[in-house]
Amino acid sequence: AMLATLFLLIITLAGMAVVVANALHNSPWGFFSVFATIPIAIFIGIYLKWLRPGKIQEATVIGVALIFAAIIYGPNVAASEYASWFTYDLQTIEIMLAVYGFFAAALPVWLLLAPRDYLSTYLKIGTIGALALGIIIVMPEIQMPAVTPYIWGGGPVLKGSVFPYIFITIACGALSGFHTVIATGTTPKMLTNEREILPIGYGAMLTEGFIAMMALIATTALHPDDYFAINSTVESFKALGLQVHELPALSAMVGEDLMHRPGGAVSLAVGMAHIFSKLPNMDHLLGYWYHFCIMFEALFIMTLIDAGTRVGRYLLQELLGHFHPKFNDQHWAPGVYGCAALICILWGYLVLQGNIGIIWPLFGVSNQLLGTMTLAVSTTVIMRLGRKRYAWVTDRKS
């Protein structure tokens, strides 16, 4: 069971990494803004650990200010002679993400993972709140039809029919195994008492549902052909005879080619930026809004990558500990670094060898299988404890 869980987790991490890589390749502004959060997080970790212990409010103000500075300074970097330092192709970005995953899984939690995830929380909440307000003010027209000709298969993004592809495509919004791994791995270590379980678990579910609604509105407000142009390959887009509408103008305003960047991150960022640009006196800031949204999404996903890779390291160490007890020691450097490296190599290899059309369905299926396993195990435990009536309300966050 542990080996199966590890295998499913590796596929899940590969699926997440593909989305970030497709959003950041050949994008100096986006790459600079997103990866600037790494040294910022390390600085905040050191600040709270040694420079000003316990001064969380100070660290929060400094960290958030530095993150916004990275976004604002991004276009200057993209237009400077140093732009080539932050411009990388797809494969290079994928390798960099695997290297980042290694350090996030091997370094102490307080140094990189915790401060980075903490700072990104403010960006996530603020961005989604601003998007909700923007939607209420702008009231964008939904352009995507409720039903397209592709529900029976043969679509430009995924070739399968709406059933069962809708469940494996939604991924975290459906039965989610990744959530169960984190909920039974890293989250319990951050709780001070059991009373925090309900507001965190149930609150996270409601928040994620709210985010899903905002994302759905933002992307369906795009013209369908523009949406497909972003999320499909060149070949499939041409084969269907589709034509772009607003996308060339949006690409010019953003300063990047937005065509054929599948994975969902770019289409969501374009949709969000399009809504924000419709606000009074905001039309000239579409480029900033787009890269701000890309940073929001990349931070959102990279928190999954670093936490998931660390959980994978824990699982692998525990598995190898059955053969060599030294691996059970979380302070044994060869075990920590070796297992972290192996996990990153495994999911990094999948990312390099596949594409979004292959990896995402694998990720979706694996994610649901892992969630099903957890659901069955947690329900069995409840019944073995003599609380059979509670088995009726067992959910994916159990």
Question: Model-found features: residue ranges?
Answer:
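Membrane-water interface regions at transmembrane-helix termini and the short interhelical loops
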Residues: G15-N26, P39-E58, I71-W85, V99-L119, ...
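Hydrophobic transmembrane alpha-helices that form the core helical bundles
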Residues: A1-K49, A59-S84, L250, H260-F276, ...
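Loop-to-transmembrane helix boundary motifs in multi-pass membrane proteins
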Residues: M2-L8, G201-F210, P262-G264, D283-C293, ...
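Hydrophobic, membrane-embedded alpha-helices of multi-pass small-molecule transporters
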Residues: D89-L107, L133-P140, W152-N193, I200-Y202, ...
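Extracellular/periplasmic helix-exit of transmembrane alpha-helices
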Residues: I135-I151, L206-G271, A307
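Conserved small/polar residues in nucleotide/adenosyl-binding loops
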Residues: S398
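Hydrophobic alpha-helical segments and their helix-loop junctions in multi-pass secondary transporters
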Residues: G45-K49, A65-I95, F103-A105, I125-I151, ...
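Selective recognition of specific alpha-helical transmembrane segments in multi-pass small-molecule
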Residues: T5-L13, A65-A70, T121-I142, R195-D226, ...
